[in-house]
Amino acid sequence: MSIFTPEVNIMIKEARTEDAAKLIEYTKIVGAQTDNLSFGKEGAGDTHEVEEFIKKISSDPNSVMYFAWKNDDIVGCANISGMKRRMSHRANFAISVAKSEWGSGIGSALLEKCISFAKDNGIEIINLDTRSDNIRAISLYKKFGFIKIGQMPAFSKINGEYIDADLMYLDLREKSNNRRKIEAYERLEAIRRENKKEIDFNKEREEAMNKKHKIQP
């Protein structure tokens, strides 16, 4: 999969163990750019740890990791981590994008790839957590249908400050999709009704004003 415009040429590929060094380099960059991740400028681990992590994901039929490549550098990363046994219908999701590429569509492309993988592999529920003040990420998740189901107080601690996290999920079951369509339609109808009320109110007010002006001497 690729994102190509006159300004952007991005390739999205599945992770390989030989990409470990590039991934470490990437995590050090993004870890220094934002406090929205579980790691800082130290990155996600050493070469052995990262290679083992990629191997573990690659060997699990319900897990996947994608990298967004710009030339020879990773500028985005997302993964689906499947669960086992009675929770095998669920998976956890995580994503990060280099700050230089925010707003380029990479986040949407990575999330779309992961959702497609989940559907193809029988995953019904995708869970994620994100800082409660990470408005950009929350907006992205909502765009794809994720719903907030709770909040975890003191989810992380950075420089002595406790950070809360929103817990969100995406239900991929067909029944749920139909329910979401109905809810979206009902919200739209509610907005239309409110707009009609406002139009009717303004019309009545205008008529009253006109009537008032007519009876004045």
Predicted regions and their residues:
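Glycine-rich phosphate/pyrophosphate-binding loop shared by adenosine-nucleotide-utilizing enzymes
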Residues: 8-10, 71-77, 163
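A short beta-loop-alpha structural element at the N-terminal edge
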Residues: 11-25
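Acetyl-CoA-dependent GNAT
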Residues: 17, 37, 41-99, 111-112, ...
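Active-site acidic-Proline motif in GNAT/NAT acetyltransferases
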Residues: 95-100, 104, 132-133
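Conserved acetyl-CoA-binding loop-helix of GNAT-fold acetyltransferases
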Residues: 103-116, 120, 139-143
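Conserved GNAT acetyl-CoA-binding A-motif
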Residues: 118-129
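Conserved catalytic-core motifs of GNAT/GCN5-like acyltransferases
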Residues: 127-130, 142, 147-163
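Short linear interaction segments
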Residues: 180-217
